[in-house]
Amino acid sequence: MALYDRRTLEGVYSVRQSVIYIQNYRYAEERMMRMMAGWIALTPELAVKLEMAKQVYEDALHTDALGKRLPELRAQPQISKPPNEAFVTFMNAIEDKEEWEDTIERLVGIYRVLKPHLISHYSSHLTAMNPVYEPPTLRILGRLVEEEKAHVERGSVLLNELLDSKEKHLRAANWQSHLEGLLGASGGVTGFEAEAEQPRKKVGRS
């Protein structure tokens, strides 16, 4: 993960770049919230249902907070934008696991792939923020990192309880590998891999 010197007033990202990233993050949070809400009725395990319901609520708050930040950066409020069609394909693959017996695949998609990926990007963005106009975004992303980490921790416990055989462990590993391939092909939530990302060329503040 790239680390940046936050002592410079200029920062790494322009206002316009920050807007694009926030729209990307909002897309991921909104899609994740909607797919998990749709899965609640399809999931037989009560503990998983209850945890999903709580996380749907918190992800809805994340979506709203990101959307409200946009007009403060001179952009239209509550807009979600995927970085590219390949990322949409990745998200569709996670969401399409709608069979009664697909709980393992659903949890793998969220807690082993999507949420850890978002945490990585949010954390990287936090290290690169402009200290003049970005403190509100810092607070939002800081909150998202902490809450998404808690989501992953609780979701991983639920997933591990379901992995009670070698066959189920193999199912989980194969699905994780498939999703990671799709995610890598998309370049991630902003269209770039977090580990390899370099700051985009500044395009101005208006």
Give the ranges of each region predicted by the language model.
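Acidic/His metal-coordination segments adjacent to aromatic residues that form catalytic metal sites
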Residues: 3-23, 82-114, 186, 190
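Amphipathic alpha-helix face/heptad-repeat signature
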Residues: 25-28, 55, 107, 111-118, ...
